[in-house]
């Protein structure tokens, strides 16, 4: 169970880092938002799911 928690936390940190870099790049590019809207929404949905997963796994470990 601890390994699953550590992997979920690592995935959350990696997704946060990727979104931290990619979202400003998408907004700064001339046609970025209209062409990459689905990618940003998918990344945000993944991030929200990982936040809940880490919370659930944390409650099972503690």
From Swiss-Prot:
Pfam family, one: Ycf9
InterPro entries to which the protein is assigned, alphabetical: PSII_PsbZ, PSII_PsbZ_sf
Positions in coiled-coil regions: none
Location relative to the cell: Plastid, Chloroplast thylakoid membrane
Classification via Gene3D superfamilies: Photosystem II PsbZ, reaction centre (1.10.287.740)
NADP recorded as keyword: no
SUPFAM superfamilies xrefs: PsbZ-like
GO biological process, one term: photosystem II stabilization
Keywords: Chloroplast, Membrane, Photosynthesis, Photosystem II, Plastid, Reaction center, Thylakoid, Transmembrane, Transmembrane helix
Any one Gene Ontology cellular component term annotated for this protein: chloroplast thylakoid membrane
Record has Membrane as a keyword: yes
Membrane topology: Multi-pass membrane protein
Ranges that cross the membrane: 8-28, 41-61
Oligomer and partners: PSII is composed of 1 copy each of membrane proteins PsbA, PsbB, PsbC, PsbD, PsbE, PsbF, PsbH, PsbI, PsbJ, PsbK, PsbL, PsbM, PsbT, PsbY, PsbZ, Psb30/Ycf12, at least 3 peripheral proteins of the oxygen-evolving complex and a large number of cofactors. It forms dimeric complexes.
HAMAP family listed in its UniProt record: PSII_PsbZ
NCBIfam families: PS_II_psbZ
Functional note: May control the interaction of photosystem II (PSII) cores with the light-harvesting antenna, regulates electron flow through the 2 photosystem reaction centers. PSII is a light-driven water plastoquinone oxidoreductase, using light energy to abstract electrons from H(2)O, generating a proton gradient subsequently used for ATP formation.
Family classification: Belongs to the PsbZ family.
Name of the molecule in the record: Photosystem II reaction center protein Z
